[in-house]
Amino acid sequence: MAITKNKISFFLFFLILFSSASFAEPYKNLSEYNFFKDIKKQIPADNVIPYKIANPLFSDYSYKFRFVHIPENKAAEYSYGSVFKFPIGTTIIKTFAYPIDERNLEEGFKLLETRLLVKNDFGWIPLSYIWNDEQTNAYLKYTGHTFNVSWISEKGEEKFVRYRAPNVNQCKSCHEINEKIQPIGPKGRNMNIDFNYQNGKANQIDYWQKRNLLKNIPNILNENPAIWDDINYNISDRARSYLDANCAHCHQKGASANNSGFYLNLDETNNSILGFYKSPVAAGRGSGGLKYIINPGKPDESILLYRMNSTDPGVMMPELSRNLKHEE
């Protein structure tokens, strides 16, 4: 059997992972971590904090339940413009699920996978747990998994998707910056919003601070996100927020699309680097015969929109996390 480059990469990743003296072997069952009071209903334990982010990645209309466990007497550090600096022992938890009927979420969800990012002396370790059919537990799996999923949409339409849980090596393609795996979502501009906690609504950053889970917070918080689907924000800021959430994890310096010279992180200000009148470095048929990544005022002549609208695996962007077009 031929050994592909991807298989070699996968093997080397785990060789390094398990040769680290600081790496404790992960649990085989998600329930063994005791992150949840009710694992099926995703009700967290008292030492696990639920959260949401302002502009989440589109993942084929899946719902995501996010949580973080920070060790007792430890705290994350606020870092302006970037992901919070979490202490060793932190676990970031994200469960992907689809509702039975989106018109009535009380009917429940079909849980598919729970991803963990575990921080230890080695760095951040990605792990994926696949849920059983009985929805009683999820089991560690390194090689990915595919689900055929159906659900009823808000419009009462039956929807279908072939949902792919990535293998652990694929996690690096989105989470690796300068050859180090790190979280993506928990940063000031994503967290500076309200969350409905069991004891009432509160700003997430204030809530974390009051629970001594976040320190070094600026006196004036000026990281206020433009919500991409909120018409109260101007269209330019909404577009930048969407592209930052859905593209910038790869399209930024030091990330997997570094060589493209095309970056979409919010703090990028150079129009050429943002793709204005920029020809692709190597898009192949992904260019669709178009000349510029962004042709201002001409979205139908822009490679960016062409690839975002495509569902062809050889063309579409992002390459992972979606099989459907984001109609909205």
Regions found by a protein language model. Give the residues of each.
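Short alpha-helix capping/helix-loop boundary micro-motifs
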Residues: 76-81
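Bacterial N-terminal signal peptides that target proteins for export
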Residues: 2-11
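Sequence context surrounding c-type heme c attachment/ligation sites in exported
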Residues: 26, 102-328
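N-terminal signal peptide c-region/cleavage motif recognized by signal peptidases
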Residues: 19-20
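Short, well-ordered loop/turn sites that connect or cap secondary structure elements
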Residues: 86-89
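N-terminal pre-domain segments of enzymes
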Residues: 23-69
